[in-house]
Amino acid sequence: MGRRFARMKTPAEPAPQSAPQRGEMAWMDGSFLPRQSLFLPVGDAGFVLGATVTEQLRTFRGRLFMANAHQERLHESLQIVGIDSGRPLTEVFDAAAELASRNHAIGPAGDDLGLVIFVTPGDQPSQQRGMGGTPRMVIHTFPLAFRLWAHAYEHGVPLRSVSVRQVPDACWPVQAKVRSRLHYFLADREAHAAESGARAVVCHLDGRVSETSTANIAIVRDGTILAPPPADALAGVSLRCAESLAESLGLAWATRSLTEQDLADADEILLTSTPNCILPATRFNGRGIGTGRPGRIYQSLLAAWSRLAGLDIAAQARAQSESTDESV
């Protein structure tokens, strides 16, 4: 009697995704191309091993913000990981600026973009008949997801302690900005299970606070802003911007390792990251921080950041979030 096989089920329709805008471009290995033509082989070490160095920027009115600082950090990450991109980073960032300008011009009025540069080692020899490849470099843009954080400028975000820990320096230095982020994924899943919308505070094995999955952390205590040293967290471009703005405002800034108890006792908690610049964390493990509302120093830094960017950062996020909601 012949062997019987189960009838194969027709795969479900994939969930709808945001399609590239007409005319939207990307850049790969020195050439501009339509975004829908962008691809990487599944045998690339960036997928097979998660060996991907990355940098994320954002635009204000279509122009890249703090591009030089991001270029410096990408250079440092490539050196740490040992990937030679094969081309000058000045050329890469010139292409990034052009790509951002072109894609911003075809987007909705008042919108802005995120821009990602990533570099992989190229083909993984074990999946290419033992033949390695040359590094691949890609630049692409996407509309900033303002609806994810527009409310937080006014109401803040909750933070949660989690059991997941930062990757030890013995594995790779915290200063390498890479895509190997499974610990962030697991940390945020644990935080979300404890409190809807909460972000995880990721600590080192010895208890030092490092960062969240998407932001650097600083606190305010007795009028002084305290931020972790470079050994504890990725050198955030936005954190450096906040420090510069604090200096211009005459605000005290100091660097030292932080603990979760420091967060619990803080007058304010500040979160800095490229897409949203600066946000307040108003709860930690279910308890209010300070007054439970965004604090004075946060408000001062946000206002200074808006002046530097040339637009009201929070107002833009609210307006674009409302526009997105209406189009859904």
What are these regions (language model features)?
Residues M1-V201, L205-R208, L234, E243-V328:
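Conserved alpha/beta cores of soluble small-molecule-handling proteins
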Residues A200-V201, R208-P230, A235:
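Glycine- and Gly-Pro-enriched alpha-helical subdomains that act as flexible
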Residues S238-L239:
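Secondary-structure junction motif
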